[in-house]
UniProtKB/Swiss-Prot annotation:
The keyword Mitochondrion does not apply. Pfam families: AmyA-A_glucT_m (PF09094), AmyA-gluTrfs_C (PF09095), Glyco_hydro_57 (PF03065). Optimum pH is 5.5. Stable above pH 5.5. One of its GO terms (biological process) is carbohydrate metabolic process. Its EC number is 3.2.1.1. It comes from Dictyoglomus thermophilum (strain ATCC 35947 / DSM 3960 / H-6-12). Keywords: Carbohydrate metabolism, Cytoplasm, Glycosidase, Hydrolase. This is Alpha-amylase 1. Gene3D superfamilies: 2.70.98.10, 3.20.110.20. The keyword Hydrolase applies. The active site is at residues 125, 216. One of its GO terms (molecular function) is carbohydrate binding. This amylase is a highly liquefying-type: oligomers appeared at the beginning of incubation, followed by a graded decrease in the amounts of maltotriose, maltose and glucose in prolonged incubation. Optimum temperature is about 90 degrees Celsius. Highly thermostable. Retains 70% of its maximal activity after heating 1 hour at 90 degrees Celsius, but no decrease in activity was observed within the same time at 80 degrees Celsius.
Length: 686
């Protein structure tokens, strides 16, 4: 008998909530459009497609002609639409109720627009945890696709993976297909004949096997060099022609069609996992380095093929431990979710939950070779939607809440007024973790800490050429000299932190590493008290250090669009004290070099990316997003300011990313015995 094998091609198309229109348009022109146009001309070649809900909404609005083409392909049975969480959340980190609702939302959208009831779903970043079976099944889904690494880790071999299995949780069943890592690296990078050879190797006479590639649509045109190879040089045309030429060997098929023809291979219980690269990225830098050394050792000793299934890496949720900013966003999402769920108004709840769903979009919560967490506009979008959700709720009063917000074992204080949210950390020197301007749904202090990443060691041998490689194998840089701005912070970049310097600081030294200049920096636990009346709320932090007492107050008002911050330093020793005192605020208004975004100091404008030292009683920030911030000081300070820039990886290589601006206000404070120095700073936001 003739050997044969089914082949199923799945295309996953996604854009993050908050991404720029021009970025999505470029992805459309280079990938989404030419790929569907190609398969539209090949109606006998079935494909599976997953579009995230955010991208579908964008396509429906901006390219209705594309929608019409998808409808035709669905009607003729060529396309099988695959569902997922509507806004592409990482399912394990959102509330269980939302797991089901996000999937059902996309199910309904696909049915309403294309007339299909999805049977399968795409799992965002293929992040799998065993309990998901129950919630996915409750949403009406019959199968998911995950990486073959999940299967290898429980002892299955490559020859066992050309079919599908059944998973079970509390009696709920869900089919699961393995995505071939081999095909992920062959398509569309290798000669199409190599794919045919690989499929031939595992073909069988009983016609029961299937090989699955389900991967990013962006790799067909948007990834570096792929538009040229896939379309201009004809890789895709050659690939499909090769499949058709070998029709006796290879049968293209949709996944659900295959399920109706072939029984499952058995029952399986998969561990927590994602694709192999993700499980490397989630590790801390030293652990990543050790994993790389282990992999290299196994390869050198020709043991990799045998033992690689058991070399797993980390666990996705640990991104919430690796990056405080990621954890903060996720805990804010849970906090806002709880407030929305407690609302007695169902109409308000529905509108607010739509914002929460968008605030669950996965992209800003993690980082690998894609920008992710390092992209300020993606973090900004998460905060925008979560603050908008809060704004649907009752906001006319001032209130506070004390609890362990970020689940680190220490209480935080959340203060809310009609204009602002302040997230305060007594355990981190009474600093501000988050400062929201609710009128514009904008987090003013959305700044990322400069951290060491494992890939920073690769900067020494980057190149401008990396053609023909998967983006997982490329080391390129978008500009020269990035190693010269590679600095690391020794604390999280929060605001209203205090420092005592040995002498008047040097700006360049502050920029590189302010901790080297500090005699004291106050990141330990502060005592606090809260006073509230019907018009304002005051949170006072205090501590005694080296003979002086430091007090810091935040005052929010019910009907005022400003915040007062008051510092008092009292000499409680028996000798006079002289201090080089400074306090720091870190702000991010997103556009460091745009003419509509600038500092105004005196009558001079400076880009947000600029360095400077000025004597000030006030300064302003103007932004193109319609927010103006003014800082008014009653005691003149020396203002030291510099841009906070990170070096991170994206699909196009190493890049510089503006994360915000640091503003350190410096004072020489002389304190006779028993005396107190005091200053009030008022921040107007409008």
């Amino acid at each position: 008998m003739t050997k044969s094998i089914y082949f199923s091609l799945g295309i996953h198309n996604h854009q993050p909530v908050g991404n720029f229109d021009f970025v999505i348009e470029r992805a459309y022109e280079m990938s989404y459009k030419p790929l569907i146009n190609f398969f539209f001309k090949h109606p006998d070649f079935p494909i599976n497609v997953h579009f995230s809900g955010f991208l579908l909404l964008w396509l429906e609005k901006n390219h209705p002609e594309y929608f019409e083409k998808l409808k035709i392909m669905a009607e003729r049975g060529q396309i099988e639409f695959v569902s997922g969480g509507f806004y592409e959340p990482i399912l394990p980190i959102i509330p269980d109720k939302d797991k089901v609702q996000q999937i059902k939302k996309l199910n309904k959208y696909i049915y309403d627009k294309f007339g299909q009831t999805p049977k399968g779903m795409w799992l965002a970043e293929r992040v799998w945890e065993p309990h998901l079976v129950k919630y996915i099944a409750e949403a009406g889904i019959e199968y998911v696709v995950v990486d073959d690494a999940h299967f290898f880790s429980v002892g299955l071999k490559e020859e066992d993976l050309f079919g599908y299995y059944l998973m079970e949780e509390q009696g709920y069943k869900l089919a699961v297909f393995p995505i071939s890592m081999k095909l992920r690296y062959l398509i569309p990078f290798a000669d199409p004949e190599e794919t045919i050879t690989y499929l031939d190797k595992f073909a069988s006479e009983d016609k029961s096997k299937i090989a699955l590639l389900f991967d990013d649509g962006e790799k067909f045109g948007l990834w570096p060099d792929t538009y040229r190879t896939v379309y201009e040089e004809g890789w895709l045309e050659t690939f499909v022609s090769k499949i058709k030429e070998n029709f006796l060997l290879v049968t293209p098929v949709n996944l659900y069609t295959y399920m109706q023809r072939v029984k499952p291979k058995g029952r399986i219980y998969l561990p927590t996992a994602s694709y192999r690269e993700m499980m490397e990225w989630v590790l801390f830098p030293e652990a990543q380095k050790e994993l790389e050394e282990l992999v290299e050792k196994l390869k050198t000793e020709n043991l990799w093929d045998k033992f690689s299934p058991y070399v797993k890496g980390g666990f996705w949720r640990n991104f919430l431990a690796k990056y405080d900013e990621s954890n903060h966003m996720q805990k804010k999402m849970l906090y806002v979710w709880k407030k929305v769920q407690d609302s007695p108004n169902e109409e308000v709840k529905e509108k607010a939950m739509e914002e929460v769903f968008q605030g669950q979009a996965n992209d800003a919560y993690w980082h690998g070779i894609f920008g992710g967490l390092y992209l300020p506009h993606l973090r900004t979008a998460i905060y925008e939607h979560l603050i908008k959700a809060e704004n649907y709720l009752e906001n006319s009063e001032i209130r506070f809440n004390i609890f362990d917000f970020d689940c680190d074992g220490n209480d935080e204080i959340i203060v809310e007024s009609p204009f602002f949210n302040l997230y305060l950390s007594p355990n981190h020197g009474g600093s501000v973790l988050e400062w929201d301007f609710k009128t514009k749904a904008f987090n003013l202090t959305n700044v990322l800490t400069r951290r060491k990443e494992a890939y920073h060691s690769k900067l020494s041998y980057v190149t401008s050429e990396a053609q023909g490689k998967s983006i997982h194998e490329r080391w390129t840089a978008k500009e020269e000299g990035l190693e010269n701005i590679l600095f690391y912070d020794n604390h999280r970049r929060v605001s209203f932190t205090e420092k005592i310097f040995e002498s008047e600081p040097v700006l360049e030294d502050l920029w590189k590493d302010s901790s080297r200049l500090e005699v004291d920096s106050f990141y330990e636990n502060y005592d606090y008290e809260i006073n509230k009346d019907e018009n304002k709320i005051r949170v006072l932090f205090s501590g005694v250090f080296r003979g002086f007492e430091l007090c810091k107050s935040y005052i929010l008002y019910k009907d005022k669009s400003f915040v007062d911050v008051v510092y008092e330093i009292k000499n409680v020793s028996e000798t006079p004290i002289s201090l080089n005192f400074g306090w720091e605020i870190n702000l991010n208004f997103l556009a460091p070099n745009h003419p509509d975004y600038y500092f105004l100091i005196g009558d001079q404008k400076y880009p947000l990316s600029s360095f400077g030292i000025e004597k000030v009683n006030n300064w302003k920030i103007f932004s193109g997003i319609g927010i103006e911030l003014e800082c008014v000081l009653d005691v003149e300070a020396s203002l030291y300011r510099y841009p906070i820039e990170t070096v991170s990886l994206s699909e196009e290589g190493f890049e510089r990313v503006y994360q915000g601006s640091a503003l350190i206000h410096f004072y020489k404070v002389d304190l006779p015995v028993g005396s107190t120095w005091r200053t009030t700073i008022r921040f107007w936001v409008k």
